[in-house]
Amino acid sequence: MGKNLLKKERDPSILILDFGSQYSELIARRIREANVFSLVVSNFISTKEIQDINPQGIILSGGPNSVYEDNAPKCDQNIFNLGIPVLGICYGMQLMVKELGGTVTPANNRSEYGRAPIKIDFESDLLSSVKDKSIMWMSHGDSINHLPNGFIKIAHTENTLHAAISNKEKKLFGVQFHPEVIHSEYGMTVIKNFVYSISKCKADWNTETFLEETIPRIKEQVGDKKVLLALSGGVDSSTLAFLLNKAIGKQLTCMFIDQGFMRKGEPEFLMEFFAKKFHIKVEYINARERFLHKLNGVTDPEEKRKIIGGEFIRVFEEESHRLGPFEYLAQGTLYPDVIESAGTNLDPKTGERIAVKIKSHHNVGGLPKDLQFKLVEPLRKLFKDEVRKLGNALGLPDEIIKRHPFPGPGLAIRILGEVSIEKLNCLRDADWIVRDEIKKAGLYNDIWQAFAVLLPVKTVGVMGDKRTYAWPVVLRCVSSEDGMTADWSRIPYETLERISNRIVNEVAQVNRVVFDITSKPPGTIEWE
């Protein structure tokens, strides 16, 4: 594979050093909500690398470790002598204190988890406009016992002596709470204070500046060469198709592989929308029978995913050779994909991950290395909400921008057990009814995902005067900000009743509808 970074990319104004926190990505998103560009990087980043990037501020994330554990993640101590403002959050603050000569002790029975009012002790730039006794979100076991020289305590709680600290002269700050989570009442105020007042960042990160910077980079990278894009119809690949079409026009070819597991009417809609309405070159590949044959007799969900992913690659290889040659491959890789799949916490000396790998994403490292493409990934540093804003700016309609996430393997992993034509047709119809009624009720844009799942068992029912023995369908509706966590959606009973009545009356081989009220965690959004 060739280089996957475009030239002259914008450097982040704020660097977030990741110590294994579940909130590191959220910190970056919150800063970008303040229109400041931020990136999550490894805690192993060197002082020299930071100086090369030249950020205006640095944030040390939280993390699950104690600073006194043998394997506790650390950072280059010289970071604190660069003159760049540093904000340590939770573990990040404790690490800074320990590295600079203070002491951190186990909290024992005085741990804090959840909401806690903070008492402000001294005025400071960091807590400017934060009201006294406002609620902040705590999640820590250890606490600071003694501050390093030059630091003062600027806030405390009932159980935490040092809820916020400051060394104004060296521009080093710390908070024991998590300002990035929505439960922290003045969390965004604290973040903006650090970003604007302390780090002197400009609010110049938005969709317009992204387009102004990215389109010339794409043109510079691609030149007059041809680019191939695998189009799925989701918001990511659709936005990328529009972006590339704007940048390089007829040099772009989209390949739409219909594996037979898409939602009702979707292949026809996508071809009509992209090829006919917007005149983007799309090659339609009908591989339905091929994929279904490969899944014959397969029931394990992970095996289904691997088979579908592997077959997609083989079809893609064959068709790219037939349609090519292509110099570049465009992928709709997003920043969370990079964080989760590549990992930010890689020890540059050993290559080992600090955090456990969550999952492999289709867009990151999914294609074989012997495909001689150079990568074009202009969305690689964007979050999902930023991609939606970009799609809107490029003229994508709401029916694309606001469509619910759909898994790469499609309906094949919403059919538990073996996949068949009969089951696909059944689930496709049931799923269409779910989305149709959710839209009619005006709930679609308020729900992260709404879909149907077909179970591999049959249940007894009565229709008319006859006994039935048919499949049950599960209705799954969840609300979420980013898909990392989710709660089940409180759908009005009237809507649930309409969905149930329509499915059992309009979909053959279904006689029962059940509603999944499991949150994530402990469950996942998808059933497989």
Curated annotation (Swiss-Prot):
Q: Name one GO molecular function term.
A: ATP binding
Q: Tell me what reaction this enzyme catalyses.
A: XMP + L-glutamine + ATP + H2O = GMP + L-glutamate + AMP + diphosphate + 2 H(+)
Does this entry carry the keyword Mitochondrion?
Answer: no
- GO cellular component terms attached to this protein's record: cytosol
The organism's superkingdom is given as Bacteria
Q: Which UniProt keywords apply?
A: ATP-binding, Glutamine amidotransferase, GMP biosynthesis, Ligase, Nucleotide-binding, Purine biosynthesis
Plastid: present as a keyword of the record? no
Subunit structure, interactors included:
Homodimer.
Which HAMAP family does this one have?
A: GMP_synthase (MF_00344)
Q: Name the chain's protein.
A: GMP synthase [glutamine-hydrolyzing]
